[in-house]
């Protein structure tokens, strides 16, 4: 699945499938980090999270779940700006917190309203990584909290 012009090629899994007349189920794509093939479940998750396709040497790549989480951890250590509560995020972005695109810092899923409200009601901070606001989705929140349980 080589593209003649990577600069104008698909930027999402959905666009990639439309461009090359493929279904999500038949798409085969490698991880940009480890070069392993993504599973069908990982491809669906990547599309659901609306993550971008990366082009290298005119070939598309995505990221497997393991590498996404690893990159999330690396970003936390390398690109941490600061942590803040919702009012600070709203003040900085000049938008209501529910309208701000905030992704999970581990799995990179965009947070839904409920996940943002969980941060607010639980008095949890959002973190700014590489000048982008991040938080925790419900799945990663429970995974993180399991480590704290006896």
UniProtKB/Swiss-Prot annotation:
**Keyword Transmembrane helix recorded:** no
Question: Which intervals hold the zinc fingers (unnamed)?
Answer: 31-67, 104-140
Q: What is the lineage of its organism?
A: Viruses, Monodnaviria, Shotokuvirae, Cossaviricota, Papovaviricetes
> Which GO cellular component terms are attached?
host cell cytoplasm; host cell nucleus
GO MF entries:
DNA binding; zinc ion binding
HAMAP family attached to this UniProt entry: HPV_E6
Query: Chief subcellular site?
Result: host cell
Supply the alphabetized keyword list.
Activator, DNA-binding, Early protein, Host cytoplasm, Host nucleus, Host-virus interaction, Inhibition of host innate immune response by virus, Metal-binding, Modulation of host cell apoptosis by virus, Transcription, Transcription regulation, Viral immunoevasion, Zinc, Zinc-finger
Tell me the GO BP annotations in alphabetical order.
DNA-templated transcription; regulation of DNA-templated transcription; symbiont-mediated perturbation of host apoptosis; symbiont-mediated perturbation of host ubiquitin-like protein modification; symbiont-mediated suppression of host innate immune response; symbiont-mediated suppression of host type I interferon-mediated signaling pathway
* Protein family according to the UniProt entry: Belongs to the papillomaviridae E6 protein family.
Name under which the protein is recorded:
Protein E6
| A Pfam family of this chain | E6
How is this protein organized at the quaternary level?
Forms homodimers. Interacts with ubiquitin-protein ligase UBE3A/E6-AP; this interaction stimulates UBE3A ubiquitin activity. Interacts with host TP53 and EP300; this interaction inhibits TP53 activity.
**Where in or outside the cell?**
Host cytoplasm; Host nucleus
Q: What else is known?
A: Belongs to the low risk human alphapapillomavirus family. The cancer-causing human papillomavirus E6 protein has a unique carboxy terminal PDZ domain containing substrate but low risk E6s do not possess this domain.
Q: Which organism is it from?
A: Human papillomavirus 11
State the function annotated in the UniProt record: Plays a major role in the induction and maintenance of cellular transformation. E6 associates with host UBE3A/E6-AP ubiquitin-protein ligase and modulates its activity. Sequesters tumor suppressor TP53 in the host cytoplasm and modulates its activity by interacting with host EP300 that results in the reduction of TP53 acetylation and activation. In turn, apoptosis induced by DNA damage is inhibited. E6 also protects host keratinocytes from apoptosis by mediating the degradation of host BAK1. May also inhibit host immune response.
Q: Which InterPro entries match?
A: E6 (IPR001334), E6_sf (IPR038575)
